[in-house]
A protein has these predicted regions:
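Short, solvent-exposed loop/turn segments at conserved positions within beta-propeller repeat blades
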Residues: 12-15, 64-73, 124-130, 157, ...
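Short loop/turn segments immediately following beta-strands, especially the blade-tip
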Residues: 19-28, 78-86, 135-144, 183-192, ...
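Asp-box/WD-like beta-propeller blade repeats and closely related beta-sheet repeat scaffolds
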Residues: 22-110
């Protein structure tokens, strides 16, 4: 629970986010709700920043009633606990005009002044179209880099990059819907890199958890969980 007692809860399909005041847990109340923020729609992931504001990934730009309602790009939006927009940025990148750029998850690295976000769609028509990640400067939301994920031997494990997790060594692990585990390094350099370091069985993997030097991943193909030892982050080892 955030120290402020304010909880953001998202109904993604409806595109509406609710902010709950839980400072009195037995008498919760809704402070406000929102759909569009700073010209963006359909938020997906939320993280607390060091200043206690919330940074959210919005999947689509809102074009307005006279045009197509949702754009093919979105962006990060910083929001306070009252639902006020603090700042925002577009993740559009002219060098990747043909790529799907709908922000999905993100990880914040305050000590490096960086944010890393993934691009993956929640819409079934485009659910297997995402293959990129983006690196931002935290203090002003400047987009520094858009890059493709590493492609493995099976040619699909990099598809639909979803959840970002900060590893114990400071690198970033990304689970994909294609059941790959990508590792991003060098985000504070001009040339960040991703490497496919593990491939789980099947596909439709989601929502990994890191505890200590272990990464736990659900694997639908085996109806169970796989635990990796990521002490050597470049070469995870299955231990359970």
């Amino acid at each position: 629970m955030p120290a402020s007692g304010m909880l953001f809860a998202n109904d993604h399909d409806a595109g509406r986010t609710f902010i709950f005041d839980l400072r009195d847990p037995l008498h919760p109340k809704i402070v406000t709700s929102f759909t569009e923020m700073a010209g963006y729609l359909h938020p997906h992931s939320y993280l607390r920043l060091p200043n206690d504001h919330v940074l959210a990934t919005f999947q689509h730009e809102h074009y307005g009633a006279s045009e197509e309602p949702m754009g093919s790009t979105g962006g990060p939006v910083e929001i306070d606990d009252q639902g006020k927009v603090i700042r925002s940025a577009s993740n559009a990148d002219p060098a990747f005009a043909g790529a799907l750029l709908t922000p999905y998850s993100l990880v914040v690295l305050p000590e490096l002044d960086r944010v890393v976000s993934t691009n993956s769609s929640m819409h079934l028509d485009y659910i297997f179209a995402g293959v990129t990640y983006q690196v931002w400067r935290l203090y002003d939301f400047k987009l520094l880099k858009t890059a493709y994920f590493d492609v493995g031997e099976n040619r699909y494990a990099q598809i639909s990059p979803e959840e970002t997790r900060l590893g114990p060594d400071g690198s970033i692990f990304v689970q994909t819907l294609g059941c790959g585990l990508e590792r991003i390094t060098g985000v504070n350099t001009d040339e960040p890199r991703s490497r496919l370091v593990y491939t789980f069985p099947g596909n439709w993997c989601g929502v990994p958890t890191i505890g200590g030097h272990y990464l736990v991943q659900s694997a639908g193909a085996m109806h169970g969980l796989i635990v990796l030892d990521i002490t050597n982050a470049a070469k995870p080892v299955e231990v359970s």
